[in-house]
Curated annotation (Swiss-Prot):
NCBIfam families: DNA_YbaB_EbfC (TIGR00103). Belongs to the YbaB/EbfC family. SUPFAM superfamilies: YbaB-like. Homodimer. Its main location: cytoplasm. Gene3D superfamilies: Nucleoid-associated protein YbaB-like domain. Keywords: Cytoplasm, DNA-binding. GO terms for cellular component: bacterial nucleoid; cytosol. This is Nucleoid-associated protein CF0672. PANTHER family: NUCLEOID-ASSOCIATED PROTEIN YBAB. The keyword Cytoplasm applies. GO terms for molecular function: DNA binding. It comes from Chlamydia felis (strain Fe/C-56) (Chlamydophila felis). The keyword Cytoplasm applies.
Length: 96
């Protein structure tokens, strides 16, 4: 095994380190989505974990629970779209 193998091994180690650093930074990133003019707000991190949910009491109607369900889905989708857009930019700079 010549220097080519050692070089590839070193490159793999560097890529692994970059991946671990990126993964750690994802937990710190925050993406917010809102629906219903701010009635519902969802914040997720870069790993798509929900960090917080805020619901304005004015949209809580026990007669129509599907309203809050729809608002939550919309807010989450907005946050995820923002995250996906940033992730695609980040991935563009990766060698793999």
């Amino acid at each position: 095994m010549g220097s080519g193998y050692a070089k590839k091994k070193k490159e793999a180690k560097i890529m692994e380190q970059q991946f671990l650093e990126m993964e750690a930074s994802l937990e710190k990133k925050r993406y917010e989505g809102q629906a219903g003019n701010g009635l519902v707000s969802v914040v997720i991190n870069g790993k798509c974990d929900i960090v917080s949910v805020k619901v304005q009491p004015t949209c809580l109607d026990p007669e129509e629970p599907e309203v809050i369900e729809d608002l939550f889905r919309s807010a989450f989708k907005e946050a995820k779209t923002a995250m996906d857009q940033e992730m695609s930019v980040m991935r563009a700079g990766l060698p793999f």
